[in-house]
Each structure stands twice: as structure tokens, then as C-alpha cells.
Amino acid sequence: MAKLTKRQKAIAEKIEAGKSYNFVDAAALLTELSTVKFSESIDVAVNLGVDPRKSDQVVRSATVLPHGTGKTVRVAVFTQGPAAEAALAAGADRVGMDDLAAEMKAGDLNYDVVIASPDAMRVVGQLGQVLGPRGLMPNPKVGTVTPDVATAVKNAKAGQVRYRTDKNGIIHTSVGKVGFDAVKLKENVEALIADLKRIKPASSKGIYVKRITLSTTMGPGLVIDQGSLEA
């Protein structure tokens, strides 16, 4: 059996196996256990009572977290005319059409979110092989194909997170960083859970939100007592 590192031993001593943690206690413990030199993200995994093999039970959406994620988000927008001016005014890092597509084809993909107005999809459609594998392809289901590009830019900059269920029916997303106020983290997670409940597939039966786990980038996962959340 492999020896545990000092960090692994410290984590093992602090965590109670099988325990469901009050959210605020879990956030405090994860912060205490974070010893890496960079600011770790705090992530949440939500196990949903869905069958991801059924197309009508795939959960895919986006949520604007009230306190953001603590990350600087770079946004590119495909649009033109007055909408382009509105996107720039809303804080977009780059706005264009064919010129922007050419840059991306050449390898300039230093963006976290790509947004497009419907009339720009003729240009964006050429970029499927470039944007798709990076999870950047605009999609109306998560609000990144929209005539109101300015609002989409503001949402992205404010800390909107996008997610979809994986093959096990779990959604994963970042909800903040180590050092965030625990109450703000809690409110971010509550906003996410409220949105997940709002878009619950009609064909999903039984318990919908089965398990919520909070973790840091390099740290352990703590199961959250759902009774400690208001969502």
C-alpha cells in the first residue's frame, strides 16, 4: 500500500468518512486544507436523478452566480452593426465577424466564452472543429446564441457558469475560489441548485438532487448536508 504524503495525512485526519457537512463548515474546512501556492477554485458536483442516456433527461443550462466565480473571463462576440457596439460597451474583449473567425482558425483562442448573434452563425458554423472540442461553440441552450449579445456579455463577465450532465448524470462547475466569504459561496451554490430544480426534466422520477459535493481543485470532496442550503 502506497504511503500517504504529509498533505494526504493531514486531510485524512480532518475529514470524517461518511459525514454530510453543513455548507459553511465545509467551506471553512476546504479553505483550511488548501495549502497550494495558487488560489484554488472551489467546485461543486451535483448528482441528479436523471438518466443521461435519454435525450429528454440531459440537463444543460447556464446560471449567473450572484457573487461570480472570482475568475477573469475573456469574451469574444460574433456580431455586427449596432449589436457590435453594444457588445463592446458591455465589456467584450473582442468583437468581429469573418476577421475574428480567421484569427480563431489561426489559433488565437484565448477566450473563456464565445457569444454569437443569430445572424452571425453562418460565420461561426465554420468553426465547429475549432470551438467544439474546447467547449466554446455558441449554443442557444446556454444563452450564447442570442440577439441580445450585450446582456450575454454582461452575464459572462459577472460569473455565469455553463454546465451539462455527464454520462453519470452529474453536473460539475466552479462556484468561487478559496478565500471567498462562505456565505457568498453558499449563495452561489443555492442559485445553482434553484436553477437546476427549475429546469428539472419532466420525465425525471424520484429524488432529483441526490447528492452535492464541494471540493477544491487539488483537495478532497465533502458531501454537503442539503438541509443547510436554502434552495
UniProtKB/Swiss-Prot annotation:
Keywords tagged on the record: Repressor, Ribonucleoprotein, Ribosomal protein, RNA-binding, rRNA-binding, Translation regulation, tRNA-binding
Any Pfam family matching the protein? Ribosomal_L1
Q: Which Gene3D superfamilies match?
A: 3.30.190.20, 3.40.50.790
One Gene Ontology cellular component: cytosolic large ribosomal subunit
* Alphabetical list of HAMAP family matching this protein: Ribosomal_uL1_B
| Family per record | Belongs to the universal ribosomal protein uL1 family.
UniProt xrefs under NCBIfam families: rplA_bact (TIGR01169)
Q: What is this protein called?
A: Large ribosomal subunit protein uL1
Annotated source species: Pseudomonas syringae pv. tomato (strain ATCC BAA-871 / DC3000)
- Could you tell me the gene encoding this protein? rplA
